[in-house]
């Protein structure tokens, strides 16, 4: 059993991380999960949350707003809609994300399908909870 796996975190703007890691905690849409070496092959969608990476330099965290994670036995690739290292997140970043979520929620209220409204409301609640979790 290998002790590490390749981890890549990519957003539309840039490659944020590419390194060997021992574990990554993923905010999955169906619940949090931890990817480790020799994990069963899995693809999951992400919900807004904090991605925690345990690498050789210690632990690093990234704020993600959604996307996909592809887990394999020896690698994990995360394609994030938006991703920001937690150390770089400011109140302005968070306010922008909350404003986008609020706008999506308002737009969804006109939809006939309640699931669209519910999803938008959940996104807004997740964004506001992230600010509290991060102390912003």
Swiss-Prot record:
The keyword Ion transport applies. Keywords: ATP synthesis, Cell inner membrane, Cell membrane, CF(1), Hydrogen ion transport, Ion transport, Membrane, Transport. The keyword RNA-binding does not apply. It is a peripheral membrane protein. F-type ATPases have 2 components, CF(1) - the catalytic core - and CF(0) - the membrane proton channel. CF(1) has five subunits: alpha(3), beta(3), gamma(1), delta(1), epsilon(1). CF(0) has three main subunits: a, b and c. Belongs to the ATPase epsilon chain family. Produces ATP from ADP in the presence of a proton gradient across the membrane. This is ATP synthase epsilon chain. It comes from Ruegeria pomeroyi (strain ATCC 700808 / DSM 15171 / DSS-3). The gene is atpC.
